[in-house]
Amino acid sequence: MSRRNTAKKRFASPDPLYKSRLVSMLTVRILKSGKKTLAQRIIYQALDIVKERTETDPLNVLEKAIRNITPLVEVKARRVGGSTYQVPIEVRAYRGTNLALRWITRFSRERSGKSMSMKLANEIMDAANETGNSIRKREETHRMAEANKAFAHYRY
């Protein structure tokens, strides 16, 4: 147990173009080797593609996608008397958003296609329409929690 003060949560500053914290959080997930401008360019291009295809505000589409992907419950391993149980716990809002962003970037990288911006745009649009791999991941997480409901009394 640490004797020091707990670290304060640092919230991401809004991005320069959309003035959105969500976009800047996504930028950090896309970022590789410290190339932030490249990550921002990929995201802005992806949002332009979303705007072109849906003819609506891309920020609203992104927020809807994140809302659709955000899990409500997840399982956490808890060791009790020599055996490990998968204990379902509720996901806090900030962690849920983080998981959603992580899944969007992971599954957009795994997609087939030419550019990362195109793959990211497709994943965002799929998530907004409640299809795609990131939605499947959320459903799988919920199924795991449902299956292990019996161990909920081991909650932290």
UniProtKB/Swiss-Prot annotation:
Any GO BP: translation
Coiled-coil features, chain-numbered ranges: none
Alphabetically, the GO molecular function entries are: rRNA binding; structural constituent of ribosome
User: Where is the protein found, in the record's own terms?
Assistant: Plastid, Chloroplast
GO CC term, one of those recorded: small ribosomal subunit
Q: Name one Pfam family in it.
A: Ribosomal_S7
Q: Does the keyword Plastid apply?
A: yes
Alphabetical keyword list? Chloroplast, Plastid, Ribonucleoprotein, Ribosomal protein, RNA-binding, rRNA-binding
Q: What does this protein do?
A: One of the primary rRNA binding proteins, it binds directly to 16S rRNA where it nucleates assembly of the head domain of the 30S subunit.
**Oligomer and partners:** Part of the 30S ribosomal subunit.
Q: What is this protein called?
A: Small ribosomal subunit protein uS7c
Supply the source organism for this entry.
Porphyra purpurea (Red seaweed)
